[in-house]
């Protein structure tokens, strides 16, 4: 599964050096991930209805080139099949040239909302939707 979304960098995402503040790339990745999850009817609201939360447990980010105010960017989100975690890879690209601005990966673990216990394998229906071989 993969999804691409477009974002035009707003002024309020810039830092004092006039480039996108590094933490806002995480926000862009979240928007991409939510769009991909919505495509497979697994929004965070649906996850909660099934009794699970999926906090991010690891995140790796590599900043390649800064995004600028008004720049049209693409957030490409790719799901990596796994039986234990929700794993997503991201590329943030310049929309005009497709040059890489940022690459990243997140890993999310299922947590039972009632007991707050970690699940070391994806529970159903998440295993059917997101599991599989790497």
Model-found features: residue ranges?
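Hot-dog-fold acyl-thioester-processing enzymes
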Residues: 1-56, 111-134
